[in-house]
Amino acid sequence: MDRIAQQYRNGKRDNNGNRMASSAISEKGHIQVNQTRTPGQMPVYRGETINLSNLPQNQIKPCKDLDDVNIRRNNSNRHSKILLLDLCAGPNTNSFLGNTNAKDITVLSLPLPSTLVKRSNYPFENLLKNYLGSDEKYIEFTKIIKDYDIFIFSDSFSRISSCLKTTFCLIEKFKKFICHFFPSPYLKFFLLEGSLNDSKAPSLGKNKKNCILPKLDLNLNVNLTSRSTLNLRINIPPPNDSNKIFLQSLKKDLIHYSPNSLQKFFQFNMPADLAPNDTILPNWLKFCSVKENEKVILKKLFNNFETLENFEMQRLEKCLKFKKKPLHQKQLSQKQRGPQSTDDSKLYSLTSLQRQYKSSLKSNIQKNQKLKLIIPKNNTSSSPSPLSSDDTIMSPINDYELTEGIQSFTKNRYSNILPYEHSRVKLPHSPKPPAVSEASTTETKTDKSYPMCPVDAKNHSCKPNDYINANYLKLTQINPDFKYIATQAPLPSTMDDFWKVITLNKVKVIISLNSDDELNLRKWDIYWNNLSYSNHTIKLQNTWENICNINGCVLRVFQVKKTAPQNDNISQDCDLPHNGDLTSITMAVSEPFIVYQLQYKNWLDSCGVDMNDIIKLHKVKNSLLFNPQSFITSLEKDVCKPDLIDDNNSELHLDTANSSPLLVHCSAGCGRTGVFVTLDFLLSILSPTTNHSNKIDVWNMTQDLIFIIVNELRKQRISMVQNLTQYIACYEALLNYFALQKQIKNALPC
């Protein structure tokens, strides 16, 4: 406005002192661009204008008022219906019918956004859908508009010699829309010159009563039920609907299939070596072994996955409604709630499964000891012992929160994958991120493709932050021995935090499920041999490609050491916690320790996986967890030994209870990560060498164990096993596992 005022003060004036309009010619010689000036006062900036009379084959005709005889003149006796489009965007510029006798003219208020109107690649149908807000109103609009063949445009300013560019663009798009969808030889387009308020009332011949009276109307709607009016009211959704929009943004990768389309997009692959209801299978998996029931199997898995999605939506809704209670109120409510009881309406109850398993174990012990000792009567009928504190669900159903993940959005690789508060990994308070070196600056600049990633570490606040996008996973009600950390692929700005998680939790094995092709897609970043971290020293000691004949599997051996941060990394303006001691926000320098990384490159995002490779990965992972020296020695001697841990050796009891957590990541840390954790946990609790801490009968139960595991994992991290393809792959993979077990069993000598 200052620039316009300066032009006004310095511009030419006529003999009466009025401001004269200055004109300029655009790059297209036939378009004259005029800057609008208001005589005798401060100019009102309306944007550039176009002289339509200079355009070749211009089909837009001028009309002085709504009584212009040219509007209704045609070469036939056909009665034409007229639609007046009021393009004024101001609150007092809408017109309406002042007299219902004017049945041949309909007034429609259409204040479309000028930014979208001027986009050449944004057609009128998209403008209309965006303005109306629903496909139903768009369809209704097209049904009504097809009856009109004369269209008058009014923006209360434009003339043929000086038409606003926004109005011109809208008219051109509207003409293309009408001529394409509703072609007619009687189509006419007029521009009403001047304001509707300045236009005299049309007489429509000698009958002065039949008129359209331009009148200001503050409402943005006209009644759809009237013959001569259109309703384009935009209904603003109630506040509760905004929650649904937010939840849909978290589940934006979800694709819904109909039961009839399952056969078109999916097929369920069953190994040929398995017989229907094969005895080698657990009871709950036998329904997937009947080849003739492929449609039924797919439909059941589809329904189960939809149920999982509905459960997750309910949890996310609780994130929006949850109000954190004080600690004393939470403890009081837990005491009042008392022990958890079995609800028959639930799809499954882990507590009930535990009681059944304990009862069966007790019965077996009694049978085995019946000949050796006499069991007192008062013990034979005793009820099962109460569950320990470890048996309780990790998070009560009302305690789901995503607050820290939303607040620390710059540390998330994806905006819709956030960690739950009750299970997220919390770091000790960190100081301000280090100054960016030349090498790290290069890494950071390449990460601009991520909207959630900070472009520069200097932009970080010096406020201590314990956040990392990672969750602890532990299914204590099934088997408490196996612990996982699911996380996203670290960003350049969070690599120090990533290695801090490893050092704090004494992680020995990292499972990386990213392919090299995803590096170009910026789905992950190399977090070793990288200068984006400063508080850790990572030394790559050795690398093996395609280990144990697993194509695309790389084993890397890292030596990890925590180092003291530089003093200049901590700003003097930062508030140190506690007593201001640096040790309260930093880690002490540690002795170097070994971390193994297994990277599997042949698992593309949102796709299935070769179960043979997963079984080998599972065994290699166990070897690195429980017997790393022997396994590394065999690799150094170029001897492939993926079976250092024999699943059939029931005498071999691994120290699973004291094992370190397994850190698993893909890109987002939920899809492929969820599938691997599900399968790894299943293979562990089904193997006699690692299932000695099972709390439920994983063989004889009738409830679907994969459904249970995925649901329990989703209680701890969002979107674990992210889509239907991955969910079906879990069942196919487990069937392949038992088919391989059957082959091994049949190959053994009798």
From Swiss-Prot:
Gene3D superfamilies: Protein tyrosine phosphatase superfamily. GO terms for cellular component: cytoplasm; nucleus. It is an enzyme of class 3 (hydrolase). It catalyses: O-phospho-L-tyrosyl-[protein] + H2O = L-tyrosyl-[protein] + phosphate. InterPro entries: Prot-tyrosine_phosphatase-like, Protein-Tyr_Phosphatase, PTP_cat, Tyr_Pase_AS, Tyr_Pase_cat, Tyr_Pase_dom. It is found in: Cytoplasm; Nucleus. Residues 1-20, 327-348, 425-450 are annotated as: Disordered. One of its GO terms (molecular function) is protein tyrosine phosphatase activity. One of its GO terms (biological process) is regulation of sporulation. Its main location: cytoplasm. Belongs to the protein-tyrosine phosphatase family. Non-receptor class subfamily. PANTHER family: PROTEIN TYROSINE PHOSPHATASE 36E, ISOFORM A, RECEPTOR-TYPE TYROSINE-PROTEIN PHOSPHATASE. Major phosphatase responsible with PTP3 for tyrosine dephosphorylation of MAP kinase HOG1 to inactivate its activity. May also be involved in the regulation of MAP kinase FUS3. May be implicated in the ubiquitin-mediated protein degradation. Interacts with HOG1. Present with 149 molecules/cell in log phase SD medium. This is Tyrosine-protein phosphatase 2. It comes from Saccharomyces cerevisiae (strain ATCC 204508 / S288c).
